[in-house]
């Protein structure tokens, strides 16, 4: 076998479905205005960074993380209003938590279901675990198709249903009555993904202990800590105990825990940043809607989805901001329902004005 080339060895060793995948694309952002990843555009104030530096200096790196961090759990409960009776599990962002949920719940061939299009990692994580992913198409207006979703639940009996509240990339926040109908119909677990909850002003967290088949999943990525990779899952302690069984040992490094603890002592700073982005979302949406041939979809997130139906399609329009080193996310080829759609994160007022100017110039040329 020593003379066998690497590609042949890979074909023998790596799963065929993995070889067929492409790695998650991350654009080169050097020197660019980043409006493509729903990050907070504001850096933390100096006093917060000083506390982070102090916490890092005082954190020993020669020992593995403790199995639990009761002090940080207490901080997270207080900062994010997690019910005292709920179980709480930390993960490296929502991505790891999605993996843990599917690994714990699904045997090969079991079904994971979500309205679609939604967060792409629901699909990817299911496939990586040999589960079957069922995406229930949204309506032509990118709203939840509740009858179709309930019919799919009845037909496929999913072990796990993922609901992004609000949804990414559409921005739609589905009504409580629709979520309630899905909770009542689902035979397994319903994961309420509240990654963008700080911008929606709505949450299921206070009610999570009343829902025997639901958990709330969140991340700190969208509120100014995307570089930290920290997510948390809250729900009935019995659910959390099962997911904890498949959690890798020492999954949360000590620096991430120390940094989060330091930042949460300044929680009003994060809240103010979220409030600012929520306030700036509507002017960005209004500016996009004023452009010729543009349809803007309502958003409860820190981003706006717009469809470009004029003389230029979404692929062509996408190039205009890029030539000015402004990154936005092109969904034109991601799903038929997203044809000619760009998703634009809410940035600073200056950044929002820059992307609107670039789009105005190309659409008016």
UniProtKB/Swiss-Prot annotation:
In which pathway does this enzyme or protein participate?
Amino-acid biosynthesis; L-histidine biosynthesis; L-histidine from 5-phospho-alpha-D-ribose 1-diphosphate: step 7/9
SUPFAM superfamilies membership: PLP-dependent transferases
The protein's required cofactor(s) are namely:
pyridoxal 5'-phosphate
What are its E.C. numbers? 2.6.1.9
Q: Which reaction does it catalyse?
A: L-histidinol phosphate + 2-oxoglutarate = 3-(imidazol-4-yl)-2-oxopropyl phosphate + L-glutamate
Q: Which Pfam families match?
A: Aminotran_1_2 (PF00155)
Query: Which CDD domains would you find in this protein's record?
Result: AAT_like
The molecular function GO annotations come to: histidinol-phosphate transaminase activity; pyridoxal phosphate binding
Positions of disulphide bridges: none
Is Lyase one of the keywords UniProt gives this record?
Answer: no
- Similarity-based family: Belongs to the class-II pyridoxal-phosphate-dependent aminotransferase family. Histidinol-phosphate aminotransferase subfamily.
Task: Kindly provide the name given to this protein in its UniProt entry.
Answer: Histidinol-phosphate aminotransferase 2
Biological source species: Bordetella pertussis (strain Tohama I / ATCC BAA-589 / NCTC 13251)
């Amino acid at each position: 076998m020593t003379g066998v080339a690497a590609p042949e060895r890979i074909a023998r060793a790596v799963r065929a479905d993995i070889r067929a995948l492409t790695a998650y694309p991350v654009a080169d952002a050097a020197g660019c205005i980043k409006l493509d990843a729903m990050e907070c555009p504001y850096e933390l104030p100096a006093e917060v960074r000083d506390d982070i530096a102090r916490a890092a200096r005082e954190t020993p790196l020669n020992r593995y993380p403790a199995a639990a961090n009761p002090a940080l759990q207490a901080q997270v409960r207080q900062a994010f209003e997690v019910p005292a009776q709920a179980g709480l599990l930390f993960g490296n962002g929502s991505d790891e938590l999605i993996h843990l949920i599917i690994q714990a719940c699904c045997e090969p061939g079991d079904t994971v279901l979500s309205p679609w299009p939604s967060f792409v990692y629901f699909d990817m994580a299911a496939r990586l675990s040999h589960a079957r992913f069922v995406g229930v198409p949204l309506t032509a207006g990118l709203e939840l198709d509740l009858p179709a979703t309930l019919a799919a639940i009845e037909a496929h009996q999913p072990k796990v249903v993922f609901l992004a509240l609000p949804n990414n990339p559409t921005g739609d926040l589905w009504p409580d009555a629709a979520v309630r109908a899905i909770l009542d119909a689902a035979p397994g677990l319903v994961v309420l993904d509240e990654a963008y909850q700080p911008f929606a002003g709505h949450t299921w967290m206070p009610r999570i202990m009343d829902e025997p088949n639901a958990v709330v999943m969140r991340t700190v990525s969208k509120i100014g800590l995307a570089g930290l990779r920290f997510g948390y899952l809250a729900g009935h302690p019995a659910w959390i105990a099962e997911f904890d069984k498949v959690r890798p040992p020492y999954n949360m490094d000590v620096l991430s825990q120390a940094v989060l603890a330091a930042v949460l002592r300044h929680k009003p700073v994060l809240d103010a940043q979220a409030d600012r982005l929520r306030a700036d979302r509507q002017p960005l949406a209004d500016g996009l809607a004023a452009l010729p041939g543009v349809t803007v979809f309502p958003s409860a997130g820190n981003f706006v989805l717009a469809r470009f139906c004029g003389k230029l399609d979404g692929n062509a329009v996408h190039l205009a901001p890029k030539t000015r080193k402004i990154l936005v996310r092109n969904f034109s080829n991601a799903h038929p329902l997203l044809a000619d759609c760009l998703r634009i994160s809410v940035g600073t007022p200056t950044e929002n004005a820059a992307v609107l100017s670039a789009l105005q110039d190309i659409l008016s040329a």
